[in-house]
Amino acid sequence: MKIAVAGGGSWGSALAHLLAANACDVTLLVRDAVQARRINADHVNPDYLPDVVLHSSVRATVDDAEALDGAGLLLMAVPCQHFRKVLQRLRPLLPPEPVVVCANKGIEVENLCTVSEVVAQELEGTGHTFAMLSGPSFAVEVMRDMPTAVVLGCRDAATGRRLRHIFSYGLFRTYSSTDVRGVELGGAVKNVIAIAAGLADGLGFGHNARAALITRGLAEMSRLGVAMGARASTFMGLSGMGDLVLTCTGDLSRNRQVGLKLAQGMTLEEVTRSMRMVAEGVKTTEAVHTLAARLQVDLPITSAMYDVLHSGKNPRDAVRELMSRELKEE
């Protein structure tokens, strides 16, 4: 199968590598011509994964038409806040009844749309098939063939079973689920909680605080998910609990790094400038905070992170307020 991968960051590159290793014909669509030349000549993505070698059959291009020519599947690994514009640009080049798999994690700030909602709006009338790939998966570990398990959400169970074979190779194992909404929300909301975990660790609050944040963060993810039509059980799986634990504890997590840097006294602007790759959780915090108010869902950790990130609240004050909330049953 020929697959076009849109997004030349670390995750798009790692998935292109995985698919090529699984005997797929992979073209990686990137923004920068210099980056494309380096990938094609040296099999290295110098900007995002400089220390690992891409599969030799991965081809990079900056040309949309070249990437999508003959492709039977489009894999989108583009940051959520730019996702809609890229999909709009690519739509005229898609084949009839396209298969689109998304591997980005976030919620649009402007329209409060999830990834699946953006695809449904932009590909309306195309007869497209949609799936969402999510779970605990640092790109560099996938590149190094370290054991990894993820989940692919697809409303049609038979299609999900077919696609999970395409996205499984070596020590990379893909499960399938029909709960697309749960899979995409777990991947998005966990980034908000990861910022909180990084902040708590950076302030020296200890392991107890981190465990509490992860556990109560999972409750927030589940409450919002159920309010938006997801199954609560999905959040106990790889795209929920799995991704939450990894992102809150692993120092390769960009969102955890945001919290750690804020704890050092950096401003959000300084943190953003210091990071080469996008930390989706900063924008997602704003979107989730607005959704929670609209749906009347209680998300205290998210609310605290919104106040810290977007209202300038002192992080220590935010934590004190969280811990002094009215007592209740778990």
Swiss-Prot record:
Report the locations given in the UniProt record.
Cytoplasm
Write out the catalysed reaction: sn-glycerol 3-phosphate + NAD(+) = dihydroxyacetone phosphate + NADH + H(+); sn-glycerol 3-phosphate + NADP(+) = dihydroxyacetone phosphate + NADPH + H(+)
Does NADP appear among the keywords?
yes
SUPFAM superfamilies, per the entry: 6-phosphogluconate dehydrogenase C-terminal domain-like, NAD(P)-binding Rossmann-fold domains
Give the residues annotated as active site.
K190
Which residues bind NADPH per the record?
A: S10, W11, R31, K105, A139, R254, V278, E280
Q: What is its EC number?
A: 1.1.1.94
**Its biological function?**
Catalyzes the reduction of the glycolytic intermediate dihydroxyacetone phosphate (DHAP) to sn-glycerol 3-phosphate (G3P), the key precursor for phospholipid synthesis.
Protein name per its UniProtKB record = Glycerol-3-phosphate dehydrogenase [NAD(P)+]
Taxonomic path: Bacteria, Pseudomonadati, Thermodesulfobacteriota, Desulfovibrionia, Desulfovibrionales
Annotated gene: gpsA
